[in-house]
Amino acid sequence: MSTQSVIAVKQFSGPDKIAQAYTVPQPSAHVLSNANYDYDLCGSTNSTSLSCAIQSSNIKTESISSSSLPKILPFSTDSNGESSLSRMSQAEFSDPILSSSSTFCTSLYTSSPMNSGSCRKTGYLPFLPQPPKCEQQQNSVGQSSSSLMLLDADLRNSGHADDEHTDDLKDFLNLSSDCSFHGKCSAMAYNEQMEFQFLSEQLGIAISNNEESPRLDDIYDRPPQLMSLPVSSCSDQEDLQDARSPAKVQLSSSRSSSGTASCNKPRLRWTPELHERFVDAVNKLEGPEKATPKGVLKLMKVEGLTIYHIKSHLQKYRLAKYLPETKEDKKQEEKKTKSVANGNDHAKKKSAQMAEALRMQMEVQKQLHEQLEVQRQLQLRIEEHARYLQKILEEQQKARESISSMTSTTEGESPEFAPMEKTEDKAETSSAPLSKCRITDTDAECHSKVDNKKTKPQADLEMVHDE
């Protein structure tokens, strides 16, 4: 179980030195039980601490002001994904205190001698603050050699307590089993790595190669080789080679290989023989619809053939089987559309022919109507001419009656004029048949003209009907 705790930094001001105390979170599965004690980096004075202080008298301790204290940032996040800020407490003491249990200089990342009794009492580990900048590294070369000698003596004398302490340190920092301190100037790299870790906890982004979430290395365009960073004191390489063989401390940057690894499927070439065996197996399983990849694989019994190959090939086989049917359906639909189009064209032609016939019929009817109109006009003229002739005949008849009456009166009055009247009557009678003959001739001519006019429209009608 991971517990959330507060890291406190105590500042002990003195004339030349400053003491710091840290409270760090409990490890998850170890015996670090007392959570309320402070691990005093510059512990109580005793004989061993005085001797250690005498040996390390040449070390130049840097005075740290309250403004230049290392930034203490949390390592544990709450349920909402937001990192809990650590609170820093400062306490000033008038007397300077020498470091006995674990001297922690600002330019070093090594732990000095630790009392086993105090370690068992407190049960806490030191916290690694931010390293100094590269400008301070050059001034700390003289300090590194003496601190390395102290580190060697402490590691030899600590015993089982140091082993427990190093195990707890590994578990707290999530270090590998073969971690130790290597002498190489990597303060800037470590500082950047810690900043990336804190940013990742604040933003909820893991510094990992997981495919689901982006990496901070990718966001800030950092090379992926920063997974392991050596943490050591800034010392000369020659002194480190003389002291002991170096081993790198690899910080766990939470590179999880939990991403889904794509399984490399071996490619298979479907030869005609293999396809024939596949088709036989599918036919035995009552067609591609009812065939299953597992059953086809059992029936084929081919080495190197997997169910993934069968699945893909069966899907392609089904698609290829349905494609010709769809092509035939398309051809039938095209034929139907062509037949429908032909039928429509034939109907259009028929309708055009009918329209043309109706138009011709309308023209013929129009011509007949004109001919009938001409015949009616002729008939009216004939009737007028007949009335005119009738009037002439009536006038002639009246004239005859008047003449006959006049002759009868004259005969009774003067018999002398009787032969003359007779001769006049004879002349009149002789002229009367001549006029009658003339009238009959004119009537005959009129009737013949009317008959000719009547026969012409009848002949035209007969010609139209014949057409």
Swiss-Prot record:
Residues 227-266, 327-353, 400-467 are annotated as: Disordered. One of its GO terms (molecular function) is DNA-binding transcription factor activity. It is found in: Nucleus. Its main location: nucleus. Gene3D superfamilies: Homeodomain-like. Residues 262-322 form the HTH myb-type domain. GO terms for cellular component: nucleus. It comes from Oryza sativa subsp. indica (Rice). Residues 293-318 bind DNA. This is Protein PHOSPHATE STARVATION RESPONSE 3. Transcription factor involved in phosphate starvation signaling. Binds to P1BS, an imperfect palindromic sequence 5'-GNATATNC-3', to promote the expression of inorganic phosphate (Pi) starvation-responsive genes. Functionally redundant with PHR1 and PHR2 in regulating Pi starvation response and Pi homeostasis.
